[in-house]
Design a protein with these regions (language model features):
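Short acidic/polar segment at the start of the alpha1 helix of CheY-like receiver
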Residues: 11-15
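Charged docking surfaces used in two-component/phosphorelay signaling
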Residues: 16-24
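Helix N-cap/capping motif at the beta->alpha junctions
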Residues: 31-40, 61
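Short amphipathic alpha-helix used as the core "switch/output" element in two-component signaling
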Residues: 40, 62-75
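Receiver (REC) domain active-site loop signature in two-component systems and cognate sites
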Residues: 56
């Protein structure tokens, strides 16, 4: 059975692209179009990783991350932020957020594969 990745992004095109790319590499993909939808899915589904858009209407990726990290069963779950922001990339590199990675948008297939695969290398 493949690893399951929850992709959270308010942009339908980004969700579709990530879904197609990750499934092509053998990952199972669950999609959520908002932070609140992601939190609901996490009560029902078990995932191995989350790709989380930072800038979303309503509940931002940062707010979603904060809620996820308060749940003991999700505290160690690998999460990578998705963003086009260079400032956010630097903030992640500086350890300002409880995430394990950053993927710059728009993401190219090879970069997405390298970033995600790195989380599952034993």
């Amino acid at each position: 059975m493949g690893k399951t990745i929850l992709v959270v992004d308010d942009d339908a095109m980004n969700l579709r692209m990530a879904d197609v790319m990750l499934k092509k590499k053998g990952y199972d993909v669950i999609k959520a179009a908002s932070g609140q939808a992601a939190l609901t899915l996490l009560q029902e589904e078990t995932v191995d990783m989350i790709l989380l858009d930072v800038e979303m209407p309503g509940m931002s990726g940062i707010e979603t991350l904060d809620v996820i990290r308060t749940r003991s069963e999700l505290a160690e779950l690998p999460i990578a932020f998705l963003s086009a922001s260079e400032d956010m990339e630097q903030a992640v590199a500086n350890g300002e957020y409880a995430v394990q990675g950053f993927i710059r948008k728009p993401f190219l297939p090879q970069k997405l594969y390298e970033s995600v695969d790195a989380f599952f290398v034993s």
